[in-house]
């Protein structure tokens, strides 16, 4: 009986040893597998990031080629044709985009500074009423009125704030300070109940314009201006009102126009694009889940990443910014690949420098998403 118990004990010890060996073996194999997977992932991401830096460099180069002698940035090639300050601001924002191994150059920094000189000069000259300009006989001529004063002012402040943040510049030219002050006063004059209207003559309030104004104020606030407190108060007013005025809770979607439930599901612009505009401009929606639903619906309905439908005369590369916010790497990669395939060499219509600006920013955002992916895996 005693001998039988001893044998049982020996068998248990042997089983335990075997079990431990198996566990150690499995852990070793698992670690080896994970290490190999990480190495392959790192290699794949390195390749992707180098590609993004190549695209970023080439797009910046093209934008720079389209800057005029006074700092203005033209919409498309040959330094001729139209200068639209709204889209020029986006092109200049593209020049500020960078990655870990592809920093903003001194040339790019100076180009954005020159553009801000030009834009601010026109802003002060027109008392904040920017227009669209055309080059005729070597001179820029006022062509037509801007379609939304509030949106144009918002994009100017967006660029100004981002430039000051990136360059850490605190010693602003005096006329820049005047330009910023004028833009802020104009925005306040267009505000009704915490929301901006299109212009003094047009009292319509648009979701997209207000998000652009909010973004401009937000970036200017981040830059740490002297009157940050005043900027913050205006920004908070708009932020508080955007969801109250524009969110249609009954239909679970964004209104395009304040107090109007008109919506055409099949229309890409403005109906569809408005649903992802808060994502594009990084607006802090209170319930993030609802924005994900709208993004998924937009992607399924319009297949924006394919870039195969020219809507209202634009490529709408801006859509990739929403993908970046959602961490949608695959669709963002597809968008940039399709853009590169279709427009990289020929730069054909309807490509504008503003579209290239969004691509630059998206290259930077996608690079960051890859960095985050590696960090998460390491943890």
State where each predicted segment sits.
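Fungal-biased detection of long, low-complexity, Ser/Thr-
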Residues: 309-314, 318-377
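Alpha-helical repeat scaffolds
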Residues: 232, 289-302, 331-341, 373-379
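Low-complexity, Ser/Thr/Pro/Gly-enriched N-terminal "stalk/linker" regions
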Residues: 40-90, 97-137, 171, 177-188, ...
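Extended ligand-binding clefts on enzyme/binding-domain cores
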Residues: 54-60, 70-86, 146-150, 174, ...
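N-terminal Sec-pathway targeting helices
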Residues: 8-26
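Well-ordered alpha-helical scaffold segments within catalytic/enzyme domains
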Residues: 46, 89-106, 154-172, 212-227, ...
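Solenoid-repeat scaffolds in large eukaryotic assemblies
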Residues: 105-108, 112, 173, 231, ...
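Acidic/His metal-coordination segments adjacent to aromatic residues that form catalytic metal sites
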Residues: 131-143, 192-203, 343-345
